[in-house]
Swiss-Prot record:
Protein name: Olfactory receptor 1D2
InterPro entries recorded: GPCR_Rhodpsn (IPR000276), GPCR_Rhodpsn_7TM (IPR017452), Olfact_rcpt (IPR000725)
Cytoplasmic side: 50-57, 121-139, 220-236, 292-312
Gene3D superfamilies: Rhodopsin 7-helix transmembrane proteins (1.20.1070.10)
Cystine pairings recorded for this chain: C97-C189
Positions annotated with a glycan in the UniProt record: N5, N195
Cell compartment(s), UniProt: Cell membrane
Length: 312
């Protein structure tokens, strides 16, 4: 695969975080455990919300969709990663790499947009509680979610189509855990100025605007909470936002660790930061949203109790 221009029929080699057999075995069991925890946690969240009428509210509607997105996200990357860790053949086809890239980019954008919509939901619940039912009607919730899907699908499509115009020369060894946009652009031997410009422009629209919206929402929420005279009511109001605030902090924090740096400085060390947003964040979200949530505790308890009774 060395030398010369590479055609679309060529393959990439996903070498991962380490080429040491001993370390690869450790990484295999670590990622397998994390994947299983992520799948079980997010499936339980989805089942609990769908089966319990008490959780048929806008907040839990978006949470179920966030769990679905996280489930889809890890399934797009981790199984292939596990196969590579156990196999001598670490190749991924050109088409397979672009497919993985498309879903990766789309689902990260979708996660981001859903978190922004959830921030709006929390803003309405805290700042306009009397109008919550009408402001967050089922029709509006479906419309907002549909908009999130359309924007994220278009975002992924734009960058994947632009990537098909990129030419790769020389070695196609990727010292990374999956086909990631920044890594692929660094391997390019053609002009990637268009890709870079579109990446910045669309990134500002898809990520910075929703992030700014989240910040503004929480500034208004905090102002509203501080005006509440009762300390117990302040705590109750803040506790309704704490889980979402934790998820937002984890998502944007890990994303900034990877992407807030110039393209030419991207290195193998960024694999560790990538694991944080690609594996750890989807795994932690079910715990964040259910840890101190009495409604979720009750729904999960009823769900598990019902299934255990069927088995006995």
């Amino acid at each position: 695969m060395d030398g010369g221009n590479q055609s679309e029929g060529s393959e990439f080699l996903l070498l991962g975080m380490s080429e040491s057999p001993e370390q690869q075995r450790i990484l295999f069991w670590m990622f397998l455990s994390m994947y299983l925890v992520t799948v079980v946690g997010n499936v339980l969240i989805i089942l609990a919300i769908s089966s319990d009428s008490c959780l048929h509210t806008p907040m839990y509607f978006f949470l179920a969709n966030l769990s679905f997105t996280d489930l889809f996200f890890v399934t797009n990357t981790i199984p292939k990663m596990l196969v590579n860790l156990q196999s001598q053949n670490k190749a991924i086809s050109y088409a397979g790499c672009l497919t993985q890239l498309y879903f990766l980019v789309s689902l990260v954008a979708l996660d981001n947009l859903i978190l922004a919509v959830m921030a709006y939901d929390r803003y309405v619940a805290i700042c306009c509680p009397l109008h919550y039912t009408t402001a967050m009607s089922p029709k509006l919730c479906i419309l907002l979610l549909s908009l999130c899907w359309v924007l994220s699908v278009l975002y992924g499509l734009i960058h994947t189509l632009l990537m098909t115009r990129v030419t790769f020369c020389g070695s196609r060894k990727i010292h990374y855990i999956f086909c990631e946009m920044y890594v692929l652009l660094r391997m390019a031997c053609s002009n990637i100025q268009t890709n870079h410009t579109v990446l910045i422009a669309t990134g500002c629209f898809i990520f910075l605007i929703p992030f700014g919206f989240v910040i503004i929402s929480y500034v208004l929420i905090i102002r509203a909470i501080l005006r509440i005279p009762s300390l117990s009511k302040k705590y109750k109001a803040f506790s309704t936002c704490a889980s979402h605030l934790g998820a937002v902090s984890l998502f944007y924090g890990t994303l900034c660790m990877v992407y807030l740096k110039p393209l030419h400085t991207y290195s193998v060390k960024d694999s560790v930061a990538t694991v944080m947003y690609a594996v750890v964040t989807p795994m932690m979200n079910p715990f964040i949203y259910s840890l101190r949530n009495k409604d979720m505790h009750g729904a999960l308890g009823r769900l598990l109790d019902k299934h255990f009774k069927r088995l006995t």
